[in-house]
């Protein structure tokens, strides 16, 4: 039996969860469709998802149709959760993009379609809610052509009055997008020769598989209209990715979750081979894993199984397997699709309302960070504050709600701030010698600092022989440098540089690793002062769509938000800008655009990386260290 994995993507309230329920019901997987309003759906598993009627994390369910098993990964639909959308898309064989007939193509529809195109995911478009009063299907289809792609094929004729009737579109003109891109078919069409439906269907399937043609279907998920033709299209057009018939096992982890009982589970896409209970499989670059239990989606449920075949999604209990881990033969992974893996851009401090809940809060945040690579949790080594780093404000709102609803924790969250970084301006070095005041430590350390290109990260090299200074002392120096890099001259993490341990001296037996660990950050700070540092801030690349009448204002307003316009094009009644903008300015820029365009602008953004900060430096207060601050001040007086 063929197994395919599909995703359902849509703007908020377009009906993708309802569509999932309708697919399960029409295929016979369930006896009654669930309701978003009643909280009985099978894919919105989190209380917050059911409460708000939006999907936050990807869930998996399944149905069978025409000897094909279809696993549905119900991908998230909120803009702050695109990272999980991209991660889920990487395991898909195809996608259904849902558009509300009432609302048409929305800003988020364009963002999601942009991601599908970027990752070359075969996609079928489903125009939902055609039974609502006042819909204009011609206008919706035209907006699909203008704002998404002209390479669409309308698969049905739709009559809305006196009752809704959906019929297969047999008009040869409906196949224009197929015929125009095939020389043989185009010659026959121009010559007036007949073209067989089989040839058209083969060309359609090839184009869909290449993600260069997008069939459009209509219906109403809530009332079951147009669902069977959609299932026929999905099972007929989409083909499983990966090497077919491969014997060697290969699978990739795309999701981690915790059950209400605290059990950790991972979701694995099996690209080749067969996985059996009690197998021992290799984790790429790590230890082996014994399969003691596994589950798969089946007919609307998650069931235990002894065997999982190529193409399947497997759910394993595991405390050690991580996101993106590869089980089995890594060389059999299909050609890697593009996938965004942005860094968190914002951070804040979070605390429980009562001190007694601190450990519970840390445990909960550790679980949440384990399931979301864009959420990071750490405890400040000096102030002991809990620091959260994240991508967007709505993400923080959801974390707070989850802590309240799922973990029963009430928290106090400070206003988020942008995460800046620092980079040395030039090569510099500094040495502090043993027994030379004001050095109170039994250690001599010399460090050099060299700036690297943006995005390089931190490199470290020890040029002091292990034969002279043993490993415990060397490790202490590196630990001290790591601590020193946490606070540069402006108080932010230092990056994009190479640190070399050039010189070390110790006195036996009085010198200890602690002396080297304490002195290293002070030497590093002095080297950075000689170098100077450049403040860096996160930048986003953007694509802006706005009505043509706002071309001048959109262009001339960009510098107000430190945005740079790189290209400008006029397409029909729309202007398209590309450029870059500091992350701290994007929310205000979007708000202003939405205001003067009456909500008709769309701004797609992706993290570009860190660049030189614009404007006055943002200085972060230095975190106190009672052990080292007195020594630092002594050195500042003599330097």
Curated annotation (Swiss-Prot):
Cross-referenced SMART domains: EFG_IV
GO biological process terms held by the UniProt record: response to antibiotic; ribosome disassembly; translation
Keywords, sorted A to Z: Antibiotic resistance, GTP-binding, Nucleotide-binding, Protein biosynthesis
Span of domain tr-type G: 1-243
Listed CDD domains: Tet_C, Tet_II, Tet_III, Tet_like_IV, TetM_like
Binding site for GTP: 10-17, 74-78, 128-131
InterPro entries, sorted: EFG_II, EFG_III/V, EFG_V-like, G_TR_CS, P-loop_NTPase, Ribosomal_Su5_D2-typ_SF, Ribsml_uS5_D2-typ_fold_subgr, Small_GTP-bd
Gene3D superfamilies, A to Z: 3.30.230.10, 3.30.70.240, Elongation Factor G (Translational Gtpase), domain 3, P-loop containing nucleotide triphosphate hydrolases, Translation factors
Alphabetized SUPFAM superfamilies for the sequence: EF-G C-terminal domain-like, P-loop containing nucleoside triphosphate hydrolases, Ribosomal protein S5 domain 2-like, Translation proteins
A Gene Ontology molecular function term of the record: GTP binding
Xref: Pfam families: EFG_C, EFG_III, EFG_IV, GTP_EFTU
Domain of life per record: Bacteria
Keyword Secreted among record annotations: no
Family listed: Belongs to the TRAFAC class translation factor GTPase superfamily. Classic translation factor GTPase family. TetM/TetO subfamily.
Function comment: Abolishes the inhibitory effect of tetracyclin on protein synthesis by a non-covalent modification of the ribosomes.
PANTHER family named in the record: RIBOSOME-RELEASING FACTOR 2, MITOCHONDRIAL, TRANSLATION ELONGATION FACTOR G-RELATED
UniProt protein name: Tetracycline resistance protein TetW
Organism in which the protein naturally occurs: Butyrivibrio fibrisolvens
Originating gene: tetW
């Amino acid at each position: 039996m063929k197994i395919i994995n599909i995703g359902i993507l849509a703007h908020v309230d377009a009906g993708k969860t309802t569509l999932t329920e309708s697919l399960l019901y029409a295929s016979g997987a369930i006896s009654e469709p669930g309701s978003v309003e009643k909280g009985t759906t099978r894919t919105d598993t989190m209380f917050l998802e059911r409460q708000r009627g939006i999907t936050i994390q990807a869930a998996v369910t399944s149905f069978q149709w025409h000897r094909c098993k279809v696993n549905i990964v119900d991908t998230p639909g909120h803009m702050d959760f695109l990272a999980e959308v991209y991660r889920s898309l990487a395991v898909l064989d195809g996608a259904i993009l849902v558009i509300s007939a009432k609302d048409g193509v929305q800003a988020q529809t364009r963002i999601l379609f942009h991601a599908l195109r970027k990752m070359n995911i075969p996609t079928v478009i489903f125009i939902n809610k055609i039974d609502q009063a006042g819909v204009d299907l011609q206008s919706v289809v035209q907006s699909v052509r203008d704002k998404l792609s002209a390479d669409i094929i309308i698969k049905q004729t739709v009559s809305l009055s006196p009752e809704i009737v959906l019929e297969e579109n047999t008009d040869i003109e409906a196949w224009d997008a197929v015929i125009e891109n095939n020389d043989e078919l185009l010659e026959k069409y121009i010559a007036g020769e007949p073209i067989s439906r089989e040839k058209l269907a083969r060309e359609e399937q090839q184009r869909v598989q290449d993600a260069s043609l997008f069939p459009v279907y209509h219906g109403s998920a809530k009332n079951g209209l147009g669902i069977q033709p959609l299932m026929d299209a999905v099972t007929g057009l989409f083909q499983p990715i990966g090497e077919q018939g491969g014997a060697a096992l290969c699978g990739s982890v795309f999701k981690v979750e915790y059950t209400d009982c605290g059990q950790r589970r991972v979701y694995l896409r099996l690209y080749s081979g067969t996985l059996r209970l009690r197998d021992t499989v290799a984790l790429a670059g790590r230890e082996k894993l014994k399969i003691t239990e596994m589950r798969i989606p089946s007919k609307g449920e998650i069931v235990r199984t002894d065997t999982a075949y190529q193409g399947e999604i497997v759910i394993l209990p595991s405390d050690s397997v991580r996101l993106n881990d590869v089980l089995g033969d890594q060389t059999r992974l299909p050609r890697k699709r593009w996938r965004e893996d942005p860094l968190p851009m914002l951070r804040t401090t979070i605390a429980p309302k009562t001190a007694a809940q601190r450990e519970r809060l840390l445990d909960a945040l550790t679980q949440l960070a384990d399931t979301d690579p864009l959420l990071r949790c750490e405890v400040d080594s000096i102030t002991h504050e809990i620091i959260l780093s994240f991508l967007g404000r709505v993400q923080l709102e959801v974390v707070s709600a989850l802590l309240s609803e799922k973990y029963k924790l009430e928290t106090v969250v400070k206003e988020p701030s942008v995460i800046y970084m620092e980079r040395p301006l030039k090569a510099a070095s500094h040495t502090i010698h043993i027994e030379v005041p004001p050095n109170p430590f039994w250690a001599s350390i010399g460090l050099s600092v060299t700036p690297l290109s943006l995005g390089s990260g931190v490199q470290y090299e020890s040029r002091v022989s292990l034969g002279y200074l043993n490993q415990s002392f060397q490790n202490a120096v590196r630990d001290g440098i790591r601590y020193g890099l946490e606070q540069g001259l402006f108080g932010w993490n230092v990056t994009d540089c190479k640190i070399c341990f050039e010189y070390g001296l110790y006195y036996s037996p009085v010198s200890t690793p602690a002396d080297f660990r304490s002195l290293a950050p002070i030497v590093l700070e002095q080297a950075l002062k000689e170098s100077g540092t450049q403040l860096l801030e996160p930048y986003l690349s953007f694509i802006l769509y706005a009505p043509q009448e706002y071309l001048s204002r959109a262009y001339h307003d960009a510098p107000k938000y430190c945005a740079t316009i790189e290209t400008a094009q006029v397409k029909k009644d729309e202007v398209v800008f590309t450029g870059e903008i500091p992350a701290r300015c994007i929310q205000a820029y979007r708000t202003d655009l939405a205001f003067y365009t009456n909500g008709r602008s769309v701004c797609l953004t992706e993290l570009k990386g860190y660049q030189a900060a614009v404007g006055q430096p943002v200085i972060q207060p230095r975190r106190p260290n009672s052990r080292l601050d007195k020594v630092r001040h002594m050195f500042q007086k003599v330097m």
